[in-house]
Curated annotation (Swiss-Prot):
GO terms for biological process: fatty acid biosynthetic process. It comes from Anaeromyxobacter dehalogenans (strain 2CP-1 / ATCC BAA-258). Keywords: Cytoplasm, Fatty acid biosynthesis, Fatty acid metabolism, Lipid biosynthesis, Lipid metabolism, Magnesium, Metal-binding, Transferase. Its EC number is 2.7.8.7. Signal peptide: none annotated. The lineage of its organism: Bacteria, Pseudomonadati, Myxococcota, Myxococcia, Myxococcales. Gene3D superfamilies: 4'-phosphopantetheinyl transferase domain. This is Holo-[acyl-carrier-protein] synthase.
Amino acid sequence: MILGLGLDVVEVARIQRILAGPPARAERFLARVFAPAERAYCDARQDRATRYAARFAAKEAAVKALGTPEGVRWLDLVVERGGGAPSLVLDGIAADAARRLGVARVHLTLTHDGGVAVAAVILEGTGP
């Protein structure tokens, strides 16, 4: 049964402006929002702003799917790429919210085209 659905769109230029801005500001943003593995993946790509935008969209979509629980940190939501399709790992308050909802599986899809990155998150389970 579908327990939650979240969708988000991020303008790649918005992330590009942050990355191209003052280095201290860019570093604060990256450290607050992205886990070390996410940063390593994105920084190793030529289109790093697009990759960061897609992951930011995934985090926003996940929060929406979870019903925007209070206190979720960006680092509680990590996009992993194990050679196949990306997956979303929940930790902390995000994982607690998923358990309360009865989530058994998190589905994630990412895409980017025309200067935007889009993510959709579907939460599947039996419910509380």
